[in-house]
């Protein structure tokens, strides 16, 4: 167990598997919880006693060992250690995972830490982790190189084989062609021979035939032919002709012709045969060449294919690189190409493997640093992000592989309990269901792996295990959320931490406590300011242990047990003892919502009958309580220290002033005001008017005798001074022996009675006393009695006897509070008495309707009819008609209100209530007696139909309907506003919670100028704004130069009066905005604590006060403005609460104003229906040259020249002189004896003004503006203002803008509260160039830390970092705080914790929230004093033991261990605190009053 005071800081980091195992008391292997029959935990299950400890104190599981005497024994039978059952809240178990799983925070966070570290996109990382893709985790370069060579050789061989095949085919083709051609040659020859032979045969036949015919003819020569003689178709001799020699000649001719024809035919046939053969040869050759080409192409394409294939496969081989993501197909292909060259895997195991093998943080950091310095744009941005993660791991000592879990811790069973319900069923924490899923899947996976199941089944089981662990850590972060029975989403470990119901906000920052109760409140008019009425029954229950102890002490009971019985039976003696006990005790009363510190105050309890708590009427304002059914809670501070603190700091009579404004918060109101107003009224003509009395006593005697009315004006002689103006004549007669004036005063008996109730220094006030007057009396009383100058030493001695020996300032404050409280009580009693005596009440007849009302309405209706007529005639637009009518009715309502006011009887009860500000105002009265007027519709637009009736007359149905809009809107707005205001308060608290006054003076020379000219803008007096500040520079009389006050002097009331008299318009004051304290704020910069009227004390939690002061009135702010027109105009800017949020979140405002970007002159331009505003900045540079006597200009006046042009040269040829040359381009100006070149540099910035935008006041053509000045109306964007005008301008702007909103709603808040918040918004700087620091570009650093680090670097001769001021909204600022506990308990818990764990963040517990979370005394108020005392004690011890040294050295020798322990204590105390007195430390009621709050679970449940 942690000893609560033994540490000064808390560190969060990643847990290694060894850490998890070292925490664990055993492995949970079964998903079972408890046995349904025995209802005892199952062995090795989620509630196993052997692992987590026994369920009953000092008793083992099997019952072998019972009682405390066996403490520490481990049962040999069931293995359970005999110890207390509360160890089940502390002891953890573990689950050994069959396969590593990733921690979802580091995978799915933005940015993904795992992804950044490995340079893998979140999408790819997710695909690997959830078994959708492979990742290469190892590459064997040697095998890869061998495989490359083998591939190249294989393809080389393939190429050669194909080429060889192609060559052999070529040879084949050539041989075939040769053969074919040879065959054709021989065929041709045989054809020729055949033709030759054929024709030879034919010739022989013809010749033979001719020979035969010749022979015949020769034989028959001279004879006549018997028939036609024919030769080859030609008739030689016709029948009957004689055969002659000619006939033979003709035959010879015919024979020759025939043979010649035959020869020709032969030649032709031979030619044909030859041609045929040639064609065939050509065909064959062509076919062969085509075949060869085809073969070549095939070869080439095959070779190309091989080259491509080889290239692809080599590329695939080269693509085998670490971290490459592969899908199933790619993985298979690569495995074929390069078996053994790489190893790819899926899931968290693969990622872990990759981290262990490849991530060398030092080397990676070096590479990334180089990249950051050498690249630009997106690459630099990414490198910076990665470097941030790498540096976080390096500095924190975390190992990246710890982001992957191999062992899963199981939280103690009592933190995830299982309880039996009435019906015998069990209710269990969702965590048990989630753990059960993990265990089931893990066991199934182990079994599958043992069985060597197919890869796909194992893979699926691993994915399911990963999803189960994800659901356990953060259900719903990825994919669909796991839901239990009844479809509700199971609450995971992350859900246990985050949100309003999470561990931080529900159990650590606010706990339900014992010794508390609540009841309805009723008014207690007879109580003193510091008292409350506590019902007896309630008190008895609250103080039960104290009563029991006193009963035993008095002997009324023998022991605690019998005392308890007596109390429970409520015997009569119990009440006396209770009276005795309660006498010394204070109780705390609290009314929710606790919007500021005055919502919890301490009171002395006064026992009363009944069941309601009685509350003093004057503290109602602080609690914002009324008696219409409000409830309040009562708490009892237990320890002496708590009682003392409640008495000195929380008692209601010491909380008279509001911490937000410094005004009294216990101002009398309502009946009291009415009573005092009635008492101090003058009624002319009342009984006894005008009588004269020699003294006050004489006048009172006359009143007692009934001779004078209480309100009758009378004349009284009296001695003394008047306070303030008198509303009746005063005549100074003379002075008494002490110099006090004697006067004759016109006053009333009522005023005499009233003044008699005032303390001596506050008399005599001779005027009508309303609410404001009573507030002044309370304020004056407090100021008078807390001013040490007004107290004598005798007074101080009296005070010392009451409060002990304390600082004089404290004594004055306590005494002033005491006197003011008693004065307030006297006024309260008087007010109630005369409110009763006066009998003021309200009846229907008191509401009198003014006769002028009908006239006003008739006149308004007449004017409206005229406007309508003009509209119908087309003289005015719809918009103008609407505006006119609204204005007419608003004026009518105003006139009616005036008439009501005039017609009112000033002595009537209604008028008295309104005029005294006791209740109600004239507008409400006007609605009752005048007219209700105009109403808004649901959109906020004013309905032009007025409600002419009032409540006295009653509304018509239509009027009632119209008025419901406004009513409903009011209610809806209020509901929305309350939630918004609450959230704003929470953000403000978070951003400012570590702002505590830590030192006296930070020593800064900087401050803040407060100008009288700002008064109009922020609606507050200059004097009011400087009051309570400390001067940052001496204040000087502007006329004489006399120093009125030195630097660091407080501006008190006297000095503000002096400033007003001398007309001083600006004062340079210390401000939280300029404070340079390393942690918190210094007293000088903060100035006066408004709640005490004195300089703030060290330890005051000014941040919390500021946040409460701004947040508490938030509900009063209207939600949004209603504009009168239908169309939004540029002045329809956000107001009220949304505007406050806009300011504090540093958002771009709605209706943003255009600002001048540079100093210059305005030009208004209109181009193509577009309005442009141009700002032109002109800079003139002049280059003058003196002209020597013999020089003449060579350029004309007004000429344009360039740099290097000749301007003048010598007119004497005998002199060898240089010409005068222009040193810059520009226009020439020639003067007497000199020549100048004037260069004009123009810079132009142009913006387009929207049509709706209206120009800001004073913006016209030729107007001179400065950078950051408004060109159009609207709110400036604070980020733009910061860039243009710098830090101071934006600070002033934010403070003034916030004040405008609050003041316009009549809410007073002191500037310094807003300044505290604005300071937090501007605390950070963004690193631009890191120089020699170890910062990273873009990192957000605390400005004081930045300055300190740079100073160190400069002192070592290094190059400092550069940075720009950042303006962060309060939400962002809260999340960038140095304390991870504060940030995690605010918002985005998982993101904050993820970041903090990786960086190994250390929380030095400097703020309030972090100390509350871990249950330590807060470093504020009395906590800070306790710290200092203890630190001084330890320093004293150290001074006696060791020489002082700043270095903390690791001591190895045993004799130094004691010194080191002392050092540790000192460190713990200086940076932390002590827990104060706990119940029982004083030995008062240690046995009888165990504190039964849930405090002992805080360590385990973080």
UniProtKB/Swiss-Prot annotation:
Cofactor stoichiometry and binding remark: Binds 1 Mg(2+) ion per subunit.
Family: Belongs to the RNA polymerase beta' chain family.
Annotated positions binding Mg(2+): 626, 628, 630
Annotated catalysed reactions: RNA(n) + a ribonucleoside 5'-triphosphate = RNA(n+1) + diphosphate
Signal peptide residue numbers: none
Key word Magnesium present: yes
Family annotation (InterPro entries): DNA-dir_RpoC_beta_prime, DNA-dir_RpoC_beta_prime_bact, RNA_pol_asu, RNA_pol_N, RNA_pol_Rpb1_1, RNA_pol_Rpb1_3, RNA_pol_Rpb1_3_sf, RNA_pol_Rpb1_4
Subunit record text: The RNAP catalytic core consists of 2 alpha, 1 beta, 1 beta' and 1 omega subunit. When a sigma factor is associated with the core the holoenzyme is formed, which can initiate transcription.
Molecular-function annotations in GO: DNA binding; DNA-directed RNA polymerase activity; magnesium ion binding; zinc ion binding
Enzyme class: transferase
Region (Disordered): 265-293, 1472-1502
Entry binding sites for Zn(2+) 1: 60, 62, 75, 78
Cofactor: Mg(2+); Zn(2+)
Enzyme Commission number(s): 2.7.7.6
Any one biological process term the GO annotation gives: DNA-templated transcription
Function of the molecule: DNA-dependent RNA polymerase catalyzes the transcription of DNA into RNA using the four ribonucleoside triphosphates as substrates.
Species lineage: Bacteria, Bacillati, Chloroflexota, Chloroflexia, Chloroflexales
Organism: Roseiflexus castenholzii (strain DSM 13941 / HLO8)
Transmembrane segments: none
Gene Ontology CC entries for this record: DNA-directed RNA polymerase complex
Feature: compositional bias, Basic and acidic residues: 279-293
SUPFAM superfamilies referenced in this protein's UniProt entry, alphabetically: beta and beta-prime subunits of DNA dependent RNA-polymerase
Protein name: DNA-directed RNA polymerase subunit beta'
Pfam families the record matches: RNA_pol_Rpb1_1 (PF04997), RNA_pol_Rpb1_2 (PF00623), RNA_pol_Rpb1_3 (PF04983), RNA_pol_Rpb1_4 (PF05000), RNA_pol_Rpb1_5 (PF04998)
Protein keywords: DNA-directed RNA polymerase, Magnesium, Metal-binding, Nucleotidyltransferase, Transcription, Transferase, Zinc
Annotated residues for binding of Zn(2+) 2: 1002, 1075, 1082, 1085
